[in-house]
């Protein structure tokens, strides 16, 4: 997916997802799990540099199947889950916390 005005962040995030898979394969035999978390649009300091970010937020609300944005607490809840025993069989995955926004491409 290409996001206008996002610059190099798109390719950087794609590299992060690929690195997650490779690290999971390399570190799995040592019992180390590696996953990536991809949140939906969040109002952060980094996001403030994206042109028309407010419009992006509104588009996310309109397009996401759950018709809402996520907040940082929901992202934190996923992090907590991944660190626990309930996720001990999950590795090499990118998990989305975005109200379904990513499925629409």
Descriptions of predicted regions:
Residues 1-15, 20-29, 41:
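Catalytic loop of short-chain dehydrogenase/reductase
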Residues 20-21, 76-79, 83:
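Short-chain dehydrogenase/reductase
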Residues 29, 41-64, 104-105:
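A glycine/serine/threonine-rich, flexible loop-to-helix segment
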Residues 17, 45, 54, 73-76:
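Residues in well-ordered alpha-helical elements
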Residues 64-75, 86:
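A conserved structural motif in NAD(P)-dependent oxidoreductases
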Residues 80, 91-105:
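Short C-terminal tail/terminal secondary-structure segment
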Residues 33-43, 83, 96-98:
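Conserved SDR Rossmann-fold cofactor-binding beta-strand/turn motif
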Residues 28, 33, 90-92:
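Short, small/polar-rich loop/turn modules that mediate ligand/substrate recognition or access, typified
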């Amino acid at each position: 997916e290409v996001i206008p005005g996002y610059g190099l962040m798109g390719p950087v995030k794609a590299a992060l997802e690929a690195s997650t898979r490779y690290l999971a394969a390399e570190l799995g035999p040592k019992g180390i799990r590696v996953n990536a978390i991809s949140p939906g649009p969040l109002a952060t300091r980094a996001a403030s540099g994206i042109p028309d970010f407010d419009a992006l937020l509104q588009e996310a609300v309109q397009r996401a199947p759950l018709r809402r944005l996520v907040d940082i607490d929901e992202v934190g809840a996923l992090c907590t889950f991944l660190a626990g025993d309930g996720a001990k069989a999950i590795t090499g995955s990118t998990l989305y916390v975005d109200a379904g926004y990513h499925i629409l491409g």
